[in-house]
A protein has these predicted regions:
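Conserved phosphate- and dinucleotide-binding cores of soluble alpha/beta proteins
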Residues: 103-220
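N-terminal active-site beta-alpha-beta segment that forms phosphate/nucleotide-binding
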Residues: 2-154
Length: 220
């Protein structure tokens, strides 16, 4: 197995390797049969609930005072529906990613990710604009977002991160935008961080960059 390198200035060969590994993992994921993917997602959701229970037990935080950041899955990603619905059942506050652009920007290139709280009625009724259009970016003060309160990163109890590829050292690859890399630097050290993926997405070794934040990966 190749050694994992840590570079402050990644070489073009590392960039090419990361792209290659990302594409290979996405291909493996896309070839999974839907019933198989659904079963694995269900098992992962149960494990996430166990992790949440452990976190609440350690911190002493009551479910109604907890806030968990999740994501609205694309069809081939780990589906979190069972986990999310159980969070609502327990009275946990649930937050989802929303892409934000600066008011002076005329395009979606200059953007960042923040978390917004979504209530159960809006989630189940599919009335959330940034879940219906996850790639669209919004102004922070947009009227479309008024019903979904901003969540400070340091107030999160737990965050679940979608992972494209990972290795045994907990190095990971996302889709290449760096949104979670930037966001994870803002959260509290007490926040439980978990990346989720299928075992089919594991690769031998990912060349790490200095800004990368390794994540415990929950994979089935």
């Amino acid at each position: 197995m190749a050694q994992t390198s840590t570079n402050s200035h990644p070489s073009s060969s590392d960039d090419q390797l990361r792209t290659k590994l990302r594409n290979e993992a996405l291909k493996e994921r896309s070839e999974m049969a839907e019933p198989y993917r659904a079963h694995k997602s269900s098992v992962i959701c149960q494990s996430l609930l166990e992790s949440l229970d452990l976190t609440l037990g350690i911190t002493g935080i009551a479910p109604e005072d907890a806030c968990v950041a999740v994501y609205s899955a694309f069809p081939e990603e780990v589906q979190l529906n069972d986990f999310i619905e159980e969070l609502y059942e327990r009275g946990v506050r649930v937050a989802f990613p929303c892409m934000i652009k600066d008011s002076w920007s005329c395009n979606d290139v200059e953007q960042k990710m923040e978390m917004r709280a979504v209530d159960a009625v809006s989630y189940l009724g599919k009335h959330v604009p940034f879940l219906l259009h996850p790639l669209k970016s919004y102004l922070h003060e947009s009227e479309e977002l008024h019903a979904f309160p901003y969540i400070c990163a340091r107030d999160l109890t737990m965050i679940v991160v979608p992972v494209v590829a990972f290795d045994k050292h907990s190095n990971r690859l996302g889709y290449g935008g760096g949104n979670y890399d930037r966001y994870l630097t803002q959260i509290s050290s007490d926040c439980r961080k978990i990346g989720v993926a299928f075992t089919e997405q594991q690769v031998d070794s990912i060349p790490a960059e200095s800004h990368d934040i390794p994540l415990p990966i929950l994979s089935i």
